Amino acid sequence: MYSVLKQSIRPRLLATHNQFRTMITAQAVLYTQHGEPKDVLFTQSFEIDDDNLAPNEVIVKTLGSPVNPSDINQIQGVYPSKPAKTTGFGTTEPAAPCGNEGLFEVIKVGSNVSSLEAGDWVIPSHVNFGTWRTHALGNDDDFIKLPNPAQSKANGKPNGLTINQGATISVNPLTAYLMLTHYVKLTPGKDWFIQNGGTSAVGKYASQIGKLLNFNSISVIRDRPNLDEVVASLKELGATQVITEDQNNSREFGPTIKEWIKQSGGEAKLALNCVGGKSSTGIARKLNNNGLMLTYGGMSFQPVTIPTSLYIFKNFTSAGFWVTELLKNNKELKTSTLNQIIAWYEEGKLTDAKSIETLYDGTKPLHELYQDGVANSKDGKQLITY
């Protein structure tokens, strides 16, 4: 369990030998008890002393932080990884900060900090950071540096990161990339992966990354009135083939998929499951011998059910994938993966999943903006910007 960043709670005005100086007044969204976000969140003001930084300390201001399903689950108390509660924000009762993903700008560094400087963009280096806030105080190793747009331009890159790309870089793109590269060796130009949830954020990243790595892919999506339009958009992103859930579950359609795979001279080696239920059974059946299915979500709330014959006669393997667990003790892997995603963004080769952005301008309590984000999350990913 990671502890939250330190907070410097002191009077707003401090007397020095010859003058008064002001403090940074910050705000954070907290909760003292688990429950529904609409019931338990509140905004807490706290102060950061920017004139008395320890040598390794860094002050950052928030540029943007999204509302993720895992954030909601943490507040509800049903997520395995939870932030520690603390009185460091100035609360009477111990309280936990909300949010795991976010993009920050460095505004001041301590005397021993050489890896960061004012103006740098950073993201948290570990989970349970507490990103639903206006500012944070931490040590330099609490952050991973990303290139800001000016730095990308100075390095000759055609594109700089957007706030949305930076604020949402550490979960969905990394999940897609690591599932495709960390477990199974897919032969470029030949081998296939199949995924359900093809229109989800991770699904779209997987289609794009698969194309960039020259992997063939099949994306499974639900039937819908504008099916042809959605299929065309997913193929434009990078999906080799797109099928419906009915086709995924149809034994009659199976030979068509086998023919696709046969024509490439490869095998279907990997399945990515975020749905469960019949959908997961269907994509598991498409794999060749020794195939692996990674489950990283369960949107249908139905159990993953695999026929016994797949285990016995095809040596099928089913495993879970949790990007938090994989990366929590492996900063090097996280950094190298981030660098690849950043390079694709800078080169214009990867399109980010768009968010619905809401600007925090101080006219509404901060926690209410995130409560609105939770309530509206079914309409798309919500991003609070500053």
From Swiss-Prot:
Gene3D superfamilies attached to this UniProt entry: Medium-chain alcohol dehydrogenases, catalytic domain, NAD(P)-binding Rossmann-like Domain
Which GO-annotated molecular functions does the record name?
A: enoyl-[acyl-carrier-protein] reductase (NADPH) activity; trans-2-enoyl-CoA reductase (NADPH) activity
- Listed GO CC annotations: mitochondrion
Q: Which SUPFAM superfamilies match?
A: GroES-like, NAD(P)-binding Rossmann-fold domains
Q: What class of enzyme is it?
A: oxidoreductase
Q: Which domain of life is it from?
A: Eukaryota
Q: Protein name, please?
A: Enoyl-[acyl-carrier-protein] reductase 1, mitochondrial
Which CDD domains does the record associate with it? Answer: ETR
Question: Could you tell me the gene encoding this protein?
Answer: ETR1
Q: Does the record carry Lipid metabolism as a key word? A: yes
Predominant subcellular localization, coarse grouping: mitochondrion
